[in-house]
Swiss-Prot record:
The gene is dxs. Homodimer. Mg(2+) binds at residues 149, 178. This is 1-deoxy-D-xylulose-5-phosphate synthase. It comes from Cytophaga hutchinsonii (strain ATCC 33406 / DSM 1761 / CIP 103989 / NBRC 15051 / NCIMB 9469 / D465). InterPro entries: Dxylulose-5-P_synthase, THDP-binding, Transketo_C/PFOR_II, Transketolase-like_Pyr-bd, Transketolase_BS, Transketolase_C, Transketolase_CS. Its EC number is 2.2.1.7. Transmembrane segments: none annotated.
Length: 636
């Protein structure tokens, strides 16, 4: 287990941190940063974001009386230092491991994790709700939301600020401005924040006036009114344009150096006494303190395990060619298709490297768009493109598509527009946990009229489904879901073939039991059949490809021949693929024993994908066991 520094090891709670002399905080920060480097290099995890807020994390817990004062982290990639300072240092080596600490703040894990996070742009809304509740209950608490400039591009953050500005709630928004999300930040807001950081005249003169008057709370309402008038005059005369946050009635302070710990402590102490909603703009460097991470912030967002001295990232080596990641199949295939079809466009909400649309952005910059953390906009922007005869491929992680459900229905499917949704990270997201699992898309998509819902079993099917979806004769909305991680076919670049919409395929014949699978999880069925071969059990296997329209012709054949049927999916059982099969059985008056394997009706925590598949009973061994049980075979 990694050992912390001599001062850090004495801190098991923020209460102990607050007992230190302020002069000791720099040492705490240095040891905290090193502890993060030591742990992530050995165990993996999100890296650069947490390094960038070490000083801010120490200052917040030093100044505010957490957990009485409530601290909300947006997304949570940057919260490792927070976890270490709040009693989880000794268990931090279990971070993002099965049955270990969550990689994100989680209410059930610690009272210091006041709000569970994982998706972006939620912190201001949550902290404002807490602040209004405290005000109603007459609790004298501070409420702090820490949000990055990337997350600030999400519309929900602006909805929250719009509301906060008409309250007098005790809310402090700390803007962690590092010009990055996972990829470099995009959009006009980025340029606006850069303008603020360079307009220092207003901030310098205002600081001089404040220093002259002293801390306004010491002088009573008259001095406060004078200071307010002086400040208003400064704004009018020195700012070229009105401050966005001030226009929303949120008092703006900054920008300040987010790595100047002593100054942060001073500023945060001052802000504690200023009532109403306010924002502190801090400038930080993502990856601060680890030179390689500062230099390449995208690569070091979550690099995996690495040599902390050399920076060499540990990558598995193989003697034989390996299958690609599904995201790379998408990234290369959309370029191939776009080279032949000039109507194809690519859209992603802030995940270009994660979904590999960055390949198209580099090669065809006028046809590929990173629209920021804005899933709702991404979908309706795609719909707008489609109205003009273009063919948008809108790539959104399955878990983030939840945020744009209304737009899929209202803006795309009701109008039957030719938008192609590529849902990356469908199924279990692994160690990122329940906030990132893509468990629900099959269920929430298959109930929408006009929408084709498909899932490839391998890389070739992904390519061919993408090819099929963009054909002009297929004018309606089309979705393709595929998992995180590696495929199964090293030689995947084969000529395109059109797939008949709504038609599955028989993978293998068999006797007695039929297994119907959807998507990549069908490869587990192949492994299960191999396990059963020595037992002379040979279930038939059907790769259905489509949940909607489902292949009714194939289902008729299956139900006429087999009375024992297993469905397998890496999505939620309620309303999913297996439910569609049961609906078909009921509607057509078939009688059969049907066992559904998939994600049960509960929140599944984090762990490696294989661990979670086993837990939920649809790994190869569990599938084989289900076949044995249906066949009445008992292992000796």
């Amino acid at each position: 287990m990694i050992q912390p520094g001599e001062l850090l090891r004495t801190i098991h709670s923020p209460e102990e941190l607050r007992k230190l002399d302020e002069t000791q905080l720099i040492q705490v920060s240095e040891e905290l940063r090193q502890f993060i480097v030591d742990n992530v290099s050995v165990y993996g995890g999100h890296f650069a974001a947490s390094l960038g807020v070490v000083e801010l994390t120490v200052a917040l817990h030093y100044v505010f009386n957490t957990p009485v004062d409530q601290l909300v982290w947006d997304v949570g990639h940057q919260a490792y230092g927070h976890k270490i300072l709040t009693g989880r240092m000794e268990n931090f080596h279990t971070n993002r491991t099965y049955n270990g600490l969550s990689g994100f703040p989680k209410r059930s894990e610690s009272p210091y994790d006041t709000f569970g996070v994982g998706h972006s742009s939620t912190s201001i809304s949550a902290a404002l709700g807490m602040a209004v509740a405290s005000q109603y209950q007459k609790d004298n608490r501070q409420h702090i939301a820490v949000i990055g400039d990337g997350a600030l591009t999400g519309g929900m953050a602006f909805e929250a600020m719009n509301h906060a500005g008409v309250t007098n709630s005790n809310l402090l928004i700390v803007l962690n401005d590092n010009c990055m999300a996972i990829d470099p930040n995009v959009g006009a807001l980025k340029d606006y924040l850069v303008d603020i950081t360079t307009s220092r005249t207003y901030n310098r003169v205002r600081d001089e006036v404040w220093n002259m008057l002293g801390k306004i709370s010491k002088f009573g309402p008259n001095a406060q009114a004078i200071a307010s008038k002086v400040e208003s005059g400064l704004k009018a005369s020195l700012l070229k344009q009105s401050n966005l946050f001030e226009s929303l009635h949120i008092r703006y302070f900054g920008p300040v150096d987010g790595h100047d710990l002593n100054h942060l402590v001073q500023v945060l102490n001052d802000l504690k006494d200023i009532p109403g909603p306010k924002i502190l703009h801090t400038l930080t460097v993502k990856g601060k303190g680890y030179a390689l991470a500062e230099k390449d912030q995208v690569k070091w967002h979550a690099p995996g395990k690495f040599d902390k001295v050399t920076g060499q990232i540990h990558v598995k080596t193989y003697d034989t060619p390996q299958a690609p990641k599904y995201q790379d199949v998408f990234g290369n295939t959309i370029i191939e298709l776009a080279e032949k079809n000039d109507k194809i466009m690519g859209i992603t909400p802030a995940m270009p490297s994660g979904c590999s649309l960055n390949l198209m952005m580099e090669k065809m910059p006028d046809r590929a768009f990173d629209v920021g953390i804005a899933e709702q906009h991404a979908v309706t922007f795609s719909a707008g493109l489609a109205t003009q005869g273009l063919i948008p491929f809108c790539n959104i992680y399955s878990t983030f598509m939840q945020r744009a459900y209304d737009q899929v229905i209202h803006d795309v499917c009701i109008q039957n527009l030719h938008v192609i949704f590529c849902l990356d990270r469908a199924g279990f997201a692994g160690v990122d946990g329940p906030t990132h699992h893509g468990a629900y898309d099959l269920a929430f998509f298959r109930c929408i009229p006009n929408l084709v819902v498909s899932a490839p079993m391998n890389e070739q099917e992904l390519r061919n489904l993408m090819y099929t979806a963009q054909l002009q004769k297929n004018k309606g909305p089309f979705s393709i879901r595929y998992p995180r991680g590696q495929g199964v076919m090293p030689n995947w670049k084969t000529p395109f073939e059109e797939i008949t919409i709504g038609k599955g395929r028989k993978v293998s014949d068999g006797d007695d039991v039929a297994i119907l699978s959807i998507g990549h999880i069908g490869n587990y069925v192949i492994e299960a059949k191999a396990l059963l071969r020595e037992e002379e059990l040979s279930p038939a296997h059907f790769d259905m490809r489509f949940v909607k329209p489902i292949d009714e012709e194939m289902l008729h054949l299956v139900f006429k021949k087999f009375k024992k049927i297993i469905t397998v999916e890496d999505g939620c059982l309620m309303g999913g693929f297996g439910s569609a099969v049961l609906e078909f059985m009921a509607d057509n008056n078939y009688a059969a024993q049907v066992i559904r394997l998939g994600i049960p009706d509960r929140i599944v925590e984090h762990g490696e994908q294989a661990e979670l598949h086993k837990e939920c009973g649809f790994d190869p061994q569990s599938i084989a066991r289900t076949v044995r049980n249906l066949s009445g075979v008992v292992l000796k």
